[in-house]
Amino acid sequence: MNNIHDHKILILDFGSQYTQLIARRIREIGVYCELWAWDVSEEQIKEFAPNGIILAGGPESVTAKDSPRAPEYVFTAGVPVLGICYGMQTMSEQLGGKVIQGVGEGEFGYAQVELQTQSELFKSIEDAISDSGKPLLDVWMSHGDKVSEIPEGFVTVANTETCPYAAMANEEKKFYGVQFHPEVTHTRQGKRMLEHFALDICQCDANWKPASIIEDAIERLKQQIGDDEVILGLSGGVDSSVVAMLLHRAIGDKLTCVFVDNGLLRLNEAQQVMDMFGDHFGLNIVHVDAENRFLDAMAGEADPEAKRKIIGHVFVDIFDEESKKCVNAKWLAQGTIYPDVIESAGSATGKAHVIKSHHNVGGLPDDMEMGLVEPLRELFKDEVRKIGLELGLPYDMLYRHPFPGPGLGVRVLGEVKKEYCDLLRLADAIFIEELHKADLYNKVSQAFTVFLPVRSVGVMGDGRKYDWVVSLRAVETIDFMTAHWAHLPYDFLGRVSNRIINEIDGISRVVYDISGKPPATIEWE
């Protein structure tokens, strides 16, 4: 088997919102890469031994005195370097070129660049031909500053009407700079440019594939764990489910999964988890029915942050109790994924800001004397899903809309009661079922129902009823950082509303949330 980490790209992060996207694109090409902060040491780079380095974008201005710079070793390491946006500007400035501050003439959004010179990076790539017979590329720009003079040894590869150096290259040293963003889908041939860089220029083999990743993970788990036993908190979500399947393949019945039913799950979800992992896949699962314990702990509490913390604390207490019963367990498995690792590194340097407290299993007791097993910590979410498919998990489960860790605890507004959860479960199930029937489920990024703790008058037959209100929420988004409300057809919404009001005793009104993010968040709490 080829070592999936033999060939690799190092991406240095200067703070761009697109940096993780670069890493995901390189991984999609089949090449392993890691994302590090820009201020790494020469020793760290040497130890990582990348086949190529990408300098990502960032919000700073190269013209500012204290703006970040690439380590000098990047340009003497003898490996290809690709600078993207800010990365191109700092490369240019550090190698003797010049960058000028943009004054009212930056480029933001769609642009067309004209190729002036042949380059390995743009080999056989074009979107159109200019009047003068030169290749044109549709790209996505997002810059104020621009390179005004390229370093010695570089040639101009592409330009736009307002940007004389939209791409530059030193083919001898294999240094390349692009002012646009090849990692975003708006740059139509962007992935091919990154393929040229990773596969042709850096000479990486495309070994980073789901089957190889699984093989490598299982081998490493066997070496790490040996004959010991492992305990895993299985939620039925994507990450913990894939961890469970990997560990089951690696160590079989030496894995104990603890599934805590907190009473805040979707309709029939607890039974589905037990059926799939227990009956179908044959995993060793401890099912803890803790609905009353969670609801009792939250009684009278209406504050969303407080509810999240209570749910987290009760889970930790239960998991701690169950782990003590597994007297031979030496290892605790977690579904940590690569963005969690990046985020915690960011918060360690003070660059990350928490908007809502995270509800991962990261809050487990410090005094659990176990080693930590994190088989997904190198993987992005889309990679985890692909691995799940390869391991035999159903598509519908892996590509289901996101569900918050606290579950219905943050979809019942205010105080959480069993009655509210039961009504919400039924309403949400109808909404999701109708989305599937209308072939709309995969056309929206996330859809769910929210329980509002207010009563509204309704008319049923000859009588009036005074019952609860639910809100439907559906959004379209690429990255969940911003989102538009989904323009679902009126007749569809009418059908969902009719079914909820007619089939669920206790709900008298259905509303549809048409708030975007920002200013609203996707979840109500």
Swiss-Prot record:
Active site residues per record: C85, H181, E183
Function: Catalyzes the synthesis of GMP from XMP.
Record domain GMPS ATP-PPase: where: 208-400
HAMAP family: GMP_synthase
Gene Ontology molecular function terms on file: ATP binding; GMP synthase activity
Organism: Shewanella woodyi (strain ATCC 51908 / MS32)
Listed name of the protein: GMP synthase [glutamine-hydrolyzing]
The reaction(s) this protein catalyses: XMP + L-glutamine + ATP + H2O = GMP + L-glutamate + AMP + diphosphate + 2 H(+)
InterPro entries: Class_I_gatase-like (IPR029062), GATASE (IPR017926), GMP_synth_C (IPR001674), GMP_synth_GATase (IPR004739), GMP_synthase (IPR022955), GMPS_ATP_PPase_dom (IPR025777), NAD/GMP_synthase (IPR022310), Rossmann-like_a/b/a_fold (IPR014729)
Keywords, sorted A to Z: ATP-binding, Glutamine amidotransferase, GMP biosynthesis, Ligase, Nucleotide-binding, Purine biosynthesis
Source taxonomy: Bacteria, Pseudomonadati, Pseudomonadota, Gammaproteobacteria, Alteromonadales
Record-listed E.C. numbers: 6.3.5.2
